[in-house]
Amino acid sequence: MLSRFEHFTYDINEIDLHWHRIASAGMKRYGLRGGTSIYLTKLSAAPDGMSASELSAACGRDKADVSRDLRQLERAGLISRGKGYRACVTLTEQGKALAEQIIRKAEYAVGFVGGSLTEEEREVFYSVLDRITENMRRLSEIGLD
């Protein structure tokens, strides 16, 4: 029988694995990882653009990872940006079109995987997930020692 730790870890890892497979399928033709799709969707909600630092904070990603991924998105013609870390990053027309596709597919995916839940179950699920996320964040800051 699985312990709660094993059950939790296994399920979270499996969800993450499948989500990345789904996201990667749409990004392969651009030679990009599925994880870069979050930057496109965040930027689509910021028509005036964001700095790499703001994008890092908004996506909960490491600044070095964001910088590397932005270079790839720029090479793919999906974003434009000025020089320097504080420069504004915006979507190109091609980036906007791809972001819209990603958002539509993500909405479909979330609807599909949560389609068997009632609205009450969905509300409870997200409430509990938010609390677990916050508790994990706090625990990672204070550590186990």
What are these regions (language model features)?
Residues 1-30, 76-78, 88:
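N-terminal leader segment of winged-helix/HTH proteins
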Residues 54-56:
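A short acidic, leucine-rich amphipathic alpha-helix
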Residues 46-51:
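Short capping segments at the starts of secondary-structure elements
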Residues 1, 120-145:
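C-terminal regulatory/oligomerization modules of transcriptional regulators
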Residues 36-40:
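Short alpha-helical "packing" element that flanks the helix-turn-helix/winged-helix DNA-binding module
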Residues 71-130:
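Charged, amphipathic alpha-helical coiled-coil/dimerization segments
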